[in-house]
Curated annotation (Swiss-Prot):
Keywords in alphabetical order: ATP synthesis, Cell inner membrane, Cell membrane, CF(0), Hydrogen ion transport, Ion transport, Membrane, Transmembrane, Transmembrane helix, Transport
Quaternary context: F-type ATPases have 2 components, CF(1) - the catalytic core - and CF(0) - the membrane proton channel. CF(1) has five subunits: alpha(3), beta(3), gamma(1), delta(1), epsilon(1). CF(0) has three main subunits: a(1), b(2) and c(9-12). The alpha and beta chains form an alternating ring which encloses part of the gamma chain. CF(1) is attached to CF(0) by a central stalk formed by the gamma and epsilon chains, while a peripheral stalk is formed by the delta and b chains.
GO cellular component labels: plasma membrane; proton-transporting ATP synthase complex
UniProt GO molecular function: proton-transporting ATP synthase activity, rotational mechanism
Main function: Key component of the proton channel; it plays a direct role in the translocation of protons across the membrane.
Family per similarity comment: Belongs to the ATPase A chain family.
Protein localization: Cell inner membrane
InterPro entries, per database record: ATP_synth_F0_asu, ATP_synth_F0_asu_AS, ATP_synth_F0_asu_bact/mt, F0_ATP_A_sf
Membrane-topology annotation of the record: Multi-pass membrane protein
Keyword flag Cell inner membrane: yes
Domain of life: Bacteria
Listed name of the protein: ATP synthase subunit a
Membrane-spanning parts: 27-47, 52-72, 87-107, 112-132, 142-162, 175-195, 198-218
Length: 241
């Protein structure tokens, strides 16, 4: 079987198209729903009883909250803390989707550019709205840094505008590419192990376990990077330059 077969999107529930848009419920849709629901349920379970001396589950949630709050404050200042719900939701969703894909028979929704691009566009659109809300039309100053010579202004505006539009694209490609690469390598080596003689199998099998552990690290790292970049972009909207 092709190592790319694991990324195939299959229809689970066929829904008639609306205005030419396929609304069918797929395995990708199912994973995103499961990732969202599982994140909510785990948070509710971890915080079902808040103690002064936190237990392991409460400590884990507090660590995630602390990471989001500290990252926001360091990049966007105290004003950025009001957007903790946006950033924390983004982090948990990306992390859950990444980790679900590592489970046996799992499907990695974040390996598809359509998913990561949609998520990136939602985040960047929200940041743009926040920017205009905080700064009004002064938000447009991010495209023309103060002190730019007049003769250089048109080129600077073009470069800054291109970089701004490229933000969601770079976020999406980075996340999808890393998820595809890791899962493909694991699939190739796993197929190699299955076709090997039993005596030789333990070594590559141990290597696969190491790769899976590394893939878990990558899944967490990519959610971390996505979140940090979101807070960096949010700093332009909240505080400007």
């Amino acid at each position: 079987m092709s190592p790319l077969e694991q990324f195939r999107v299959t229809k689970l529930l066929d829904i008639p198209a609306l205005w030419g848009i396929d609304l069918s419920f797929t395995n990708c849709s199912l994973v995103m729903v499961l990732a969202s629901v599982s994140s909510i349920l785990l948070l509710c379970w971890a915080l079902r009883k808040i103690n002064v001396v936190p237990g392991p589950s409460q400590t884990a949630v507090e660590l995630i909250y602390g990471f989001v709050a500290n990252t926001l404050e360091s990049n966007a200042g105290a004003e950025g803390l009001r957007y903790i719900p946006l950033v924390m939701t983004t982090f948990l969703f990306v992390l859950a989707c990444n980790l679900v894909g590592i489970l046996p028979f799992g499907f990695t929704a974040t390996s598809h550019l359509s998913v990561t691009l949609a998520l990136s566009l939602v985040v960047c659109t929200a940041i743009t709205v926040i920017g205009f809300r905080h700064q009004g039309l002064h938000f447009l100053r991010i495209f023309l840094p103060e002190g730019t010579p007049l003769w250089l202004a048109p080129m600077m505006v073009f470069i800054k505008l291109f970089a701004y539009v490229a933000r969601p694209v770079s976020l999406a490609i980075r996340l999808a590419a890393n998820m595809i690469a890791g899962h493909t390598i694991i699939a190739v080596i796993a197929d190699f192990v299955l076709k090997m003689h039993l005596v030789l199998a333990p070594l590559p099998f141990a290597f696969i376990m190491g790769l899976i552990a590394f893939e878990i690290f990558v899944a967490i790292l990519q959610a971390y990077i996505f979140t940090v970049l979101t807070t960096v972009y949010l700093s332009d909207a909240v505080a400007g330059h």
